[in-house]
Amino acid sequence: MQQFCGVNVIAYYSTSIFRDGGYSLSEALLVSMGGGIINFLFAIPAIYTIDTFGRRNLLLVTFPLMAACLFFTGGVFNIPESNRDPRIACITTGLYLFMAVYSPGLGPVPFTYSAEAFPLHIRDIGMASSTAITWGFNFIISFTWPALRRSFGDTGAFSWYGAWNIFGFVFCYFLLPETKNLTLEELDNVFSVSNREHAAYYTRKLPWYLKKYILRKDVPPFPELYEFAANDGQYPQEKPDAKHIEGNNSVPPSADREVFSRTR
């Protein structure tokens, strides 16, 4: 999904995209350099947010925003070329916002996540394979971008990658567990859960999100993923409180004294 979000076609072809938008060659080169600077600067917060906000949450927030930026940029190409200033201003804004959103989310998260997803005994092979696959798709996407633009136009090409970002959001919501601040044992528990159970867990959690964040209700914490899976997709049964049991079964002090006096 890192490649299919469209970041590398923008990075590789930004100069030609800006030129088609209405910039001169020197202006397009300068504006392209600005996109690289934004990519660098907005990647810095990920040093902190990746372990505080979480890998999963970063992706769930940035995928819809990247999709919106690409749909917006693609739509701007429908503005007549005679309106040069608003056209190039909107194209620049859309692509700059895309890079700003990508950098703290889908930029660093996949590499961190893939390092945690593989068991220790195959982690080196897994990381090498995932990196090779990533750059293989990078070649395919960068090679096919000119043909995609010729076939579907600028609006269609940007919308194509915008649609992939929407797919990425759905995929991450239902199938991507959170791994921040987890020990190796907890990671094993999380990744031992099947995709079917994972999708069922987050399907059940949708009403909880609605009540807590939309309706602003006071709801109890939702059980952890591996606790949910260990109970066959049901909420873990609450253990009775020890004080509650003791209170129900305890003998009043007066009765204690009466029994003691009789035994004497």
Model-identified regions with their sequence ranges:
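Alpha-helical transmembrane bundle of multi-pass membrane proteins
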Residues: 1-264
